[in-house]
Regions:
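Phosphate/nucleotide-binding beta-alpha loop and adjacent structural elements of enzyme active sites
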Residues: 1-154
Length: 154
């Protein structure tokens, strides 16, 4: 399962030198300490949900690292959208209306909503990052469409 893959494991297996990480869909930042532990110097995180971002900011403030956080969703065009908030600690929240998820995980509901701002990854002009972690519940292609220039630098 993809969730079991660690950045440390990837860097060791493929002899990668990860200097900086762009983490899209950072939730509350539980992976950030791993990035720091393996020597990642620059970290840029994106998390659109306000409660998650507040917890993320608090968690980041306790770390002595070069971390920049942005409270936005990323996509292929700038706009405001409604996110569907999941009942599983918002881990499955999505810009896309839940369909298949409801069948595979009937215990998870999407009763709450939150308006979020969507921006282009390219609008951030990120330097010094050579690795992307993305977890946006099926919206990955839209994020990559808005990040073509950034992807060329990775």
């Amino acid at each position: 399962m993809l969730h079991d893959i660690s950045l440390k494991g990837l860097t060791e297996k493929y002899n990668m030198d990860v200097k900086g990480v762009i983490h899209i869909g950072a939730h509350r930042g539980r992976n950030i300490i791993e990035y720091i532990d393996i020597g990642v110097r620059d970290i840029v995180v994106f998390e659109p949900l306000s409660d998650n971002f507040n917890i993320l900011e608090q968690n980041l403030s306790e770390l002595n690292a070069n971390i920049i956080g942005h409270q936005v969703a990323l996509g292929s065009e700038e706009k405001k959208v409604t996110m569907y908030l999941s009942s599983n600690d918002t881990q499955s929240s999505s810009i896309l209306k839940p369909k298949v998820h409801l069948t595979h995980h009937p215990d998870v509901s999407f009763d709450d909503r939150e308006e979020v701002e969507v921006k282009l990854l390219d609008s951030y002009n990120i330097e010094n990052c050579n690795f992307i972690v993305i977890d946006v519940q099926g919206y990955e292609l839209e994020v990559f469409k808005g990040g073509k220039k950034t992807l060329e630098k990775i």
